[in-house]
UniProtKB/Swiss-Prot annotation:
Its EC number is 3.4.21.62. It is found in: Secreted. InterPro entries: Peptidase_S8/S53_dom (IPR000209), Peptidase_S8/S53_dom_sf (IPR036852), Peptidase_S8_Asp-AS (IPR023827), Peptidase_S8_His-AS (IPR022398), Peptidase_S8_Ser-AS (IPR023828), Peptidase_S8_subtilisin-like (IPR050131), Peptidase_S8_subtilisin-rel (IPR015500), Subtilisin_Carlsberg-like (IPR034202). This is Subtilisin BL. Secretion of subtilisin is associated with onset of sporulation, and many mutations which block sporulation at early stages affect expression levels of subtilisin. However, subtilisin is not necessary for normal sporulation. GO terms for biological process: proteolysis; sporulation resulting in formation of a cellular spore. It is an enzyme of class 3 (hydrolase). Its cofactor is Ca(2+). Pfam families: Peptidase_S8.
Length: 269
């Protein structure tokens, strides 16, 4: 049987699905540790930019989990994603150890721009700025990619990079009570929040796992972006980003929550 993870319900994705909005025709690149073949995922393509790891299969688990929150299939098994018909692309920029070079991430963003991706999910970050990475985010954005990135997990009152860059949409994490997760980085530049605690999703070995992190929050927003893009195919990445913020459910302090909790129902009305 298929279960609907709490975060998918909380962002009201099923209401969008009931309107026929499932992310169909929208290309979403997952810049991560790769994505493992899984019965609850449909992976359309991708590329690896990790030296020594030519396969886009996931030797870590992180990328497969992120991918499921975006687009786990609406079938009779496992879990359900925010945009179950979105086209998933596995862009490996982090190795099996979960670490990656700035150059790899920049190449992944370049690939997303070159290959017509509508959304790029970056559930990754660093406390240090990088001109190379900022340029890559700006270039991908100029080519129509909506770059969605995790705020970071140190609990600090500042946002990680690349999420902090103006052209990246920074996503923080909330818990089941719609409170900021204790680990979720916040402050200037935070755009929006989404569920990031006890998030159930796909995992390598045709299994499922529950994980915590702003990495888990980010794909809820990437998935919602795919729903909005299907409904409004002519909209630019900037229009989609602004619409997601304008339709978010306010949770109070913009410092802690940005525009609030992403709301797929309001965003697809």
């Amino acid at each position: 049987a298929q279960s609907v993870p709490w975060g998918i319900s909380r962002v009201q994705a099923p209401a969008a699905h009931n309107r026929g909005l499932t992310g169909s025709g929208v290309k979403v690149a997952v810049l991560d540790t790769g994505i493992s073949t899984h019965p609850d995922l449909n992976i359309r393509g991708g590329a690896s930019f990790v030296p020594g790891e030519p396969s886009t299969q996931d030797g870590n688990g992180h990328g497969t989990h992120v991918a499921g929150t975006i687009a786990a299939l609406n079938n009779s098994i496992g879990v359900l994603g925010v945009a179950p018909s979105a086209e998933l692309y596995a862009v490996k920029v982090l190795g099996a150890d979960g670490r990656g070079a700035i150059s790899s991430i920049a190449q992944g963003l370049e690939w997303a721009g070159n290959n017509g991706m509508h959304v790029a999910n970056l559930s990754l970050g660093s406390p240090s700025p990088s001109a190379t990475l900022e340029q890559a985010v700006n270039s991908a954005t100029s080519r129509g990619v909506l770059v969605v990135a995790a705020s970071g997990n140190s609990g600090a009152s500042s946002i990680s990079y690349p999420a902090r860059y103006a052209n990246a949409m920074a996503v923080g994490a909330t818990d089941q009570n719609n409170n900021r997760a204790s680990f979720s980085q916040y402050g200037a530049g935070l755009d929006i929040v989404a569920p990031g605690v006890n998030v159930q999703s796909t995992y390598p070995g045709s299994t499922y796992a529950s994980l915590n992190g702003t990495s888990m929050a980010t794909p809820h927003v990437a998935g919602a972006a795919a729903l909005v893009k299907q409904k409004n195919p002519s909209w630019s990445n900037v229009q989609i980003r602004n619409h997601l913020k304008n339709t978010a459910t306010s949770l109070g302090s913009t410092n802690l929550y940005g525009s609030g909790l992403v709301n797929a129902e309001a965003a697809t009305r």
